[in-house]
Amino acid sequence: MKDLTKKSILKLKQSSTLVINEKCKNLINKGKKVYQFGFGQSPFPVPEKIVSTLKNNAHRKEYLPIQGLAQLRESISKNLKKKIGINYPKENIVITPGSKEAMLLLHVAFNGEIILSAPSWVSYEPQAIIGRNKVHWIQTSRENNWFPTAQQLEKKIKSIKKKNLILIINSPNNPSGTICKNLKELAKVAKKYNLIVLSDEIYTDLTFCNKYESISQHYPERTCISGGLSKWCGAGGWRVGFFAVPNELSELLENVKTLASESYSTV
């Protein structure tokens, strides 16, 4: 039989980072020495406190609330408040099986279009395609630290007819490894045009400086934050992420929760 798959899905391929990781494992199993630079897997062990806590709760088997454990959401809320000074109450936080799932649900729920910078993480565009959201690219350069300038962002916004737009910011960035130094300027443009910002902050605790800056500090009212254990904790295979949403975007939060309730049981 033919035509079993939607045309939009036929355009997609398996995530290149995961495919390359499997190829590397196969080569290693064959005795080959592989230097792998394409996968964000920490070589360090998961902190012992987290390991022991997981062991102590291994007997827990009940279904959980759609948004995840209240105690965990409260801890994330307090941590965000401590690090960036912005209040995302636990009621506005959803625990997901990895931050990747959180972003996918946002793409599926969102009725609009996406602004991405090039280069960017390999899964942003495929997720937008799954959500049937058109992607608009901004080409970046080394001179601007591989992030769009405020002028580039404003020019791109003016060229788009759709009113509902999400700007995705990933700082520290995958794949460049750089930190965005013009968040305040980008936030000013985003606010001017009423953009939604998705701040992918999965790498925020992996920097050579103690300063942690989030675009939400400059535009809290319409900035969503995604994060998780995968990078700083080295627990990519555990699949624990979160999605924090400001009060102004409660409609999106409710619909992400609806999608979550029909797809997985959370932590």
Task: Identify the residue ranges that each predicted region occupies.
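Hydrophobic residues in well-ordered beta-strands that form the structural core
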Residues: L116, W137, V197-S199, I225
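Short acidic capping loops at alpha-helix termini that bridge into adjacent secondary structure
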Residues: N87-I93, G112-E113, E221-R222
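Helix C-cap/helix->beta junction micro-motif
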Residues: L27-K30, G131, K192-Y193
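N-terminal small-domain helix-loop-helix segment of the aminotransferase-like
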Residues: D3-P97
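PLP-dependent aminotransferase class I/II
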Residues: C224-V267
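Generic structural signal for small/hydrophobic residues in well-ordered secondary structure
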Residues: I20, F37, L54, I76, ...
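Conserved PLP-anchoring active-site segment centered on the Schiff-base-forming lysine
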Residues: A109-A128
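Active-site phosphate-binding strand-loop segment of PLP-dependent enzymes
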Residues: T140-N210
